[in-house]
Design a protein with these regions (language model features):
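Membrane-interface "cap" regions at the ends of multi-pass membrane proteins
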Residues: 1-14, 63-65, 69-77, 185-191
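Extracellular loop-to-transmembrane helix junctions
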Residues: 19-65, 71-76, 92-122, 147, ...
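Loop-to-transmembrane helix boundary motifs in multi-pass membrane proteins
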Residues: 69-73, 112-121, 214-240, 305-340, ...
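Membrane-interface loop-to-helix entry segments
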Residues: 131-162, 228, 295, 348-361, ...
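Helix-loop-helix junctions that connect adjacent transmembrane segments
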Residues: 146, 153-203, 396, 400
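Extracellular/periplasmic helix-exit of transmembrane alpha-helices
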Residues: 157-170, 224-265
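A generic transmembrane alpha-helix motif of multi-pass inner-membrane proteins
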Residues: 347, 364-456
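Cytosolic C-terminal regulatory domains/tails of membrane transporters and channels
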Residues: 427-590
Length: 590
């Protein structure tokens, strides 16, 4: 909960100020609407997501299952772009906001007045913590969140007590409401219009699901408990902070350059409790803002290795933690330099990433319930519409968020496709298994030259194999009565990258056939030839016919659909998989 909370709870550092700038005196009412959306929208949705995806892949995994083949993977790449926007900007924005608290503290020397440099130091320190390991990150998160929440409970509680002691604050606030907005209906309508600007207060749910693999015991039940606890704590804190800051802080102090700008609760800490407590609160806020990136980093480290390497769209080293942490830290450096560590410039992209992921989660849950013929899809459909409205409103008002997300999406898609092309001639097989009949075929030919004829599956009747055998004997000058094995690979989901090759034997009128299915036919044949070599301790010879057609067209067909000019690609896969030519299965084309 604390690893999720450093992201979720840290928004208290700037959320009250954003709420007042967006809604003015309506800020507490708009915050109540946000809390209702949290408790009755986001929380039910992510409780369903946690049950459907206990490995931490979240709503993205659910949508991947709902859409087959390349369509599902294309959607995943787009959503990964928004997830990257959310998580990376969480890291950079929080560190930049921590920097703002540092350089504007009266006790900090002016030599630190370099936002980009200070932010990069904070990001490097965060990366170093994760390179050391998850356990250390969780331990630090627990300490930071416990102290920060304790200080906020005291600060908000004292603020409410101050309002109780001075009841004139309440009529002053209600008079401002009626003066500006006339009647309660108009107040509610305006609050519904402005509450999407407060969407940063929803930031912890996707991260909460993403870190599920770190939850011990009954993972789904405990994750739901974690999300529920975090949501309830944050709901109370959001409403309390909005009330005390709106009623106790002069409106002019919220303006840009004002004493409460970007640090409303810190303003109250200094104003009511003196510089010592105020500085302690500043240090706690700086710590949680800096470490807010920890939960985002955990989410990235969980998402990326589960998708891109499996799609063949990233090198295998991206499954390891330390290289990924180094890569993500370098990206955060770049983003910080591009945006000059400006918090406001990154805010739109942050909210856009959060809302798109939440909307996709609501869509995934609604579709899953609808497919299961459960009538509960109707309330989740309503939640989806509300999240959709919130997202569209945010995009219209802050289009820069979509632009930044588009940059992430294009970068992920382009680099993923390049990686897929570069890795297309890898073996792409996780293992080979053969049924008893296939094993018996291999045992029969183990003590004689092993000749394999590649056959494109057709009718599966005796005449097909008799014709193919005669053709191979004429083309390759095979001796009469030569014992051969036929190999057939049926194309499966071409969008998949690697899987276990399950080989089944078939006896068609005395012709022995080895059959399997694979997303990439040449790679499967290469893997099967290496398997035959290892099982029989002999070098197999495989016989192919030349393919009629343009080789460039067949190359593109292989990249997209896993089949094309089979023989030369099979030979290239074997060349990369087995570096010793003497041990490499032989390929014959005629």
């Amino acid at each position: 909960m604390c690893l999720t909370g450093v992201d979720y709870f840290s928004t208290l550092g700037y959320q009250p100020g954003i709420a007042f700038l967006a809604a003015g005196a309506l800020a507490p009412i708009a915050t109540v609407i946000l809390v209702l959306l949290t408790l009755f929208g986001a929380l039910p949705v992510y409780s369903k997501v946690a049950a459907a995806s206990p490995d931490g892949q979240g709503s993205i995994s659910m949508l991947e299952d709902l859409l087959p083949r390349w369509r599902g993977k294309a959607l995943v790449l787009v959503l990964l772009g928004f997830a990257a926007t959310d998580f990376i900007i969480t890291i950079t924005l929080s560190a930049a906001d921590a920097t703002e608290h540092i350089i504007h503290n009266p006790f900090v020397p002016h030599m630190f007045d370099h936002p980009v440099g200070v932010t990069i130091v904070l990001l490097a320190a965060l990366g170093a913590v994760f390179i050391k390991g998850f356990k250390e990150a969780i331990g630090i998160a627990v300490v930071i969140v416990a102290i920060y929440l304790a200080l906020n409970v005291f600060l908000i509680g004292h603020g409410l007590l101050e309002i109780f002691r001075h009841p004139e604050y309440v009529p002053r606030w209600t008079n401002a409401l009626y003066t500006q907005h006339g009647n309660p209906v108009m107040m509610l309508a305006l609050a519904l219009l402005v509450f999407p600007k407060l969407a940063l207060g929803l930031s912890g749910f996707e991260t909460g699901v993403a870190v599920m693999p770190l939850v011990a015991g009954d993972r789904v039940r405990n994750t739901r408990k974690m999300l529920r606890s975090a949501a309830l704590i944050m709901s109370v804190a959001l409403i309390g902070s909005s009330v005390v800051t709106t009623l106790l802080i002069p409106p002019a102090a919220f303006a840009e350059g004002g004493e409460a700008s970007g640090r409303a609760l810190a303003y109250l800490a200094h104003h009511y409790h003196g510089e010592l407590f105020g500085t302690i609160y500043d240090i706690s806020t700086i710590a949680i803002l800096w470490f807010a990136g920890a939960s985002a980093m955990a989410g990235l480290l969980n998402l990326v290795p589960r998708y891109l390497p499996r799609y063949g769209m990233a090198p295998e080293w991206t499954r390891a933690t330390r290289p990924l942490v180094t890569l993500f830290t370098a990206i955060t450096f770049l983003i910080t330099v591009i945006f000059k560590a400006n918090v406001a410039a990154q805010g739109g992209a942050y909210a856009t990433g959060v809302l798109v992921l939440m909307t996709s989660a609501a869509v995934a849950v609604t579709l899953a319930l609808w497919r299961a013929s459960s009538r509960s899809w109707i309330p989740f459909g309503v939640i989806t519409l509300i999240f959709g409205y919130t997202t569209v409103t945010n995009v219209i008002e802050r289009p820069d968020g979509v632009k930044i997300a588009a940059w992430f999406i294009v970068t992920i898609v382009v680099t993923s496709l390049i990686s897929r092309v570069l890795r297309s001639t890898e073996l792409r097989v996780l293992g080979v298994t053969a049924d008893p009949l296939a094993q018996s075929f291999l045992q029969e030919v183990a003590h004689s030259p092993i000749r394999i004829i590649a056959n494109r599956p057709d009718s599966g009747l005796f005449d097909e194999y008799a014709h193919k055998l005669r053709e191979a004997q004429e083309t390759h000058h095979l001796p009469p009565n030569t014992r051969v094995l036929f190999v057939e690979v049926r194309p499966s989901d071409a969008s998949a990258f690697s899987e276990v090759l399950n080989v089944a034997g078939a006896d068609i009128g005395g012709h022995h056939v080895l059959r399997c299915a694979s997303p990439a036919i040449p790679n499967a044949i290469a893997a099967l030839l290496l398997f035959i070599r290892d099982e029989t301790k002999q070098i197999p010879h495989a016989y192919f016919g030349w393919t009629e057609g343009n080789p460039i067209v067949y190359l593109l067909k292989f990249l997209a659909f896993g089949e094309g000019d089979t023989a030369p690609v099979t030979r290239e896969v074997l060349r990369q998989a087995e570096h010793d030519p003497e041990l490499r299965p032989r390929i014959h084309i005629g």
